[in-house]
Swiss-Prot record:
Belongs to the Symplekin family. This is Symplekin. The HEAT repeats have been determined based on 3D-structure analysis and are not detected by sequence-based prediction programs. Disruption phenotype: RNAi-mediated knockdown results in overproliferation of testicular cystocytes undergoing transit amplification leading to increased incidence of spermatogonial tumors.
Amino acid sequence: MDSIIGRSQFVSETANLFTDEKTATARAKVVDWCNELVIASPSTKCELLAKVQETVLGSCAELAEEFLESVLSLAHDSNMEVRKQVVAFVEQVCKVKVELLPHVINVVSMLLRDNSAQVIKRVIQACGSIYKNGLQYLCSLMEPGDSAEQAWNILSLIKAQILDMIDNENDGIRTNAIKFLEGVVVLQSFADEDSLKRDGDFSLADVPDHCTLFRREKLQEEGNNILDILLQFHGTTHISSVNLIACTSSLCTIAKMRPIFMGAVVEAFKQLNANLPPTLTDSQVSSVRKSLKMQLQTLLKNRGAFEFASTIRGMLVDLGSSTNEIQKLIPKMDKQEMARRQKRILENAAQSLAKRARLACEQQDQQQREMELDTEELERQKQKSTRVNEKFLAEHFRNPETVVTLVLEFLPSLPTEVPQKFLQEYTPIREMSIQQQVTNISRFFGEQLSEKRLGPGAATFSREPPMRVKKVQAIESTLTAMEVDEDAVQKLSEEEFQRKEEATKKLRETMERAKGEQTVIEKMKERAKTLKLQEITKPLPRNLKEKFLTDAVRRILNSERQCIKGGVSSKRRKLVTVIAATFPDNVRYGIMEFILEDIKQRIDLAFSWLFEEYSLLQGFTRHTYVKTENRPDHAYNELLNKLIFGIGERCDHKDKIILIRRVYLEAPILPEVSIGHLVQLSLDDEFSQHGLELIKDLAVLRPPRKNRFVRVLLNFSVHERLDLRDLAQAHLVSLYHVHKILPARIDEFALEWLKFIEQESPPAAVFSQDFGRPTEEPDWREDTTKVCFGLAFTLLPYKPEVYLQQICQVFVSTSAELKRTILRSLDIPIKKMGVESPTLLQLIEDCPKGMETLVIRIIYILTERVPSPHEELVRRVRDLYQNKVKDVRVMIPVLSGLTRSELISVLPKLIKLNPAVVKEVFNRLLGIGAEFAHQTMAMTPTDILVALHTIDTSVCDIKAIVKATSLCLAERDLYTQEVLMAVLQQLVEVTPLPTLMMRTTIQSLTLYPRLANFVMNLLQRLIIKQVWRQKVIWEGFLKTVQRLKPQSMPILLHLPPAQLVDALQQCPDLRPALSEYAESMQDEPMNGSGITQQVLDIISGKSVDVFVTDESGGYISAEHIKKEAPDPSEISVISTVPVLTSLVPLPVPPPIGSDLNQPLPPGED
């Protein structure tokens, strides 16, 4: 095994196998993610792109080229975040696989022109590393191809684009552009011994000499130019504080990385410290000075700043640094190093002086050089102009119409005689084609146009005549001054004299000509006379001037379409605005009428006029020269009111809503008259909803006038009209709960009106024309009461700790009629508060004196249409019933939350209540009606009916139980035949038998006759239980037998003789049927189950002595009947119906005697 593993080939193949498997897994994942990118949301796309980047570029870089196009296609995505994620992917690609630069660089250039500033900033950030990696990659290529050359061209284009962005409007883009240019300057310059060293640094020293794409010198020159631009930008007066701090930091980094630029940077910092931009605020100045101090401290630590240490120290002292702090920053150097640097400083200074002197000499030489006209260049320009003019003319001379027109145009201008020059230069045309003639004529005219510098060829001439340095031939003269020929000296003297004479002559002529011109000018001044318009014109009549004015304004107004087509509609609107605001009333009213003719399309013009009036009112713009006796705000108020009235009268409903809303929301100020008009508009049925909504929005959007608009809504919240009241209260809730606008004022108003109810009669403050109740009323009406507490009830769910307490106080002190009104209005606010409101639960638990009815009503509301009441509510109600309120009605709302034992214990008290309340109770218990159908009880209908029968009659009147059972049996949908069978089956098992059992049996038999056989069996079981011992049940037994005859006759024969005698005595009508049945039985032979002679005698009516040994006669007295022990626990219920008094039970008659010694009926032994 070791030998196998030791083989390198095997290890290599195994590694390749695992690598291939890893790549395949990664490829499958990336394919799935790329498929999801098509339909994913923007946020999901960003997550998927991050996963692709992590997988492809993090662990499987060989997949980068395969999925590159899929990712780059998202560069056109509409979402900004997705495009930024693509930029991050491209940046990482250029770090991991820089050879893919030609494939991605076009996308970078495209995204640099994106519409989103965020994307542009992200691209600029990425371009820093992309440019560095790309430059290193291109330098490493031995033979760069076309793709590499194209990539370098695009990189250069990107560099130029970012350089232009240093003047971008966006502050963040400028900051990122500065940081990018910082990197470019560092990359395109040489490092020296003092440069700050970093990992992966790149400088011009790394650019190979054989690189064909770019040269060191060119890159260095470009880097120097970019540094100059940064220095210039750093010194501008309009630079922002953010850009200034960023530029300062970048220049400091450049100086640290390339100390060769240290002098320029220190000089820039010195200028900045002396002259901070005037646009900065005090806090910005402090930030800039703090940043400058920090950058200077950083520079001072660098060895390359040794030459400028004194300058930096001076600036740091000025910026607040102490001498000790500065001394700690200076790097430590030995004496040799300091001497070497001092020597280098002197050498640099000497070189600088020599260079400066050399430049001064060159400049002086250039100034001393004489210039002359460059005739060769001038001739070359003339020839080029002639060719251009000749070509132009030849194209036009080919058209006969042009030639004819030209001849006819200039024919009258020909001289009478042929000029001599024409005769000298003219050559007759012999045997030339038309093309040759056109060429010849075009050349001739072209030369003339060039002489005059006319035609299209005039563009070839330079603006100034071409000049060149005058060439002076060097004449070597070895003659000394003594050897100069006298004739030559005399000749030179004569030439110089003639030259001076000519110059004097020209000067004299010029002075004479100037003197003549001055004389002419003075004579012209003498003849000139000032022209006065008033002396040569007459004033127009006033009416005519006004007519001209109105006609001119009307023409301006009617030129609307022409101005729109010409693109000057904004200038026309400005002109009309100024005219309307500054001209007399007749012009103003005319413009107003023009606007109102089509207010929907001309509303912008109206707003321009409105704002112009506002500017005049506030003194922001020119003042009108029209004299008026009105108040300063009259023009503005009049215009605004006319706009509002015009919109209301001339627009349809839809446009009226939109335009009125715009006017009120966009008007600079709203006078009281306009607010009053809005109040009147809100009283209109069609506009009331939109008007109140507008008032609410004005309260939110116009904080200075919020008190006024809230007061308007408060007035509407107590208006007589219900629709206005509801809308106003809803908007006040929004201001109160959502926007938190004047909550204290709203609380004060609501509580003030709530307390009006405590008074015996409505106060005068309730009645006003503003509230829709102009006439006072002596007594409270239900509507007036609801108006007073309506706002308080609306705000109750949002501040229950305040309003619930006040409502309780008012409820206690008010009259019974007003209490009923309050109870009927509690539903909506209590339901909004909910059963979990701690304030409500605390009120139920405390239940102050006099608040019982209110608390009961609250419990009813909280339990409406709820399957099962809240446990906390049930607990509070149970405690309330046990400790404070001993009225069982308090338990009614929470019946569905009680246990079975609690229901059984409280049932006797419930059925003794008012019939209406008892009906409601059984509707709840049985789930009758839509209101209670969803409730779930702990007892079934069967249990309820059985519980009613087992109620102790000493605790509850028998009549109440009878009524309760009747209510149950009336619900045939619930108490079906099967349910009643179950009830009777349970009742027959009860000991002693329930008093109303036989009554229920008879009612069940009446409802469902098919129960006859079941009842027969039931009667037999009753005989076994000696039914005759309970008189009421015995009577019911006999009535049941009567109903079931003749089928029930066998039941009578099972009775003991004494009870049979009693039955026949109480029900004589049974005797014939029984006799008939007995005779039918006599035909059968006697057997053990036959009819005895004693029974036959009883049936026939013969006298038979029947002995009864029990003195009770077989009946059990009421006091000896076994009773169920009552449950001591009681549960409370709430109702607004009064309780009926309990009925007094009827006395029980004495029992009838019976013989206990009689033999048992057949089958009982």
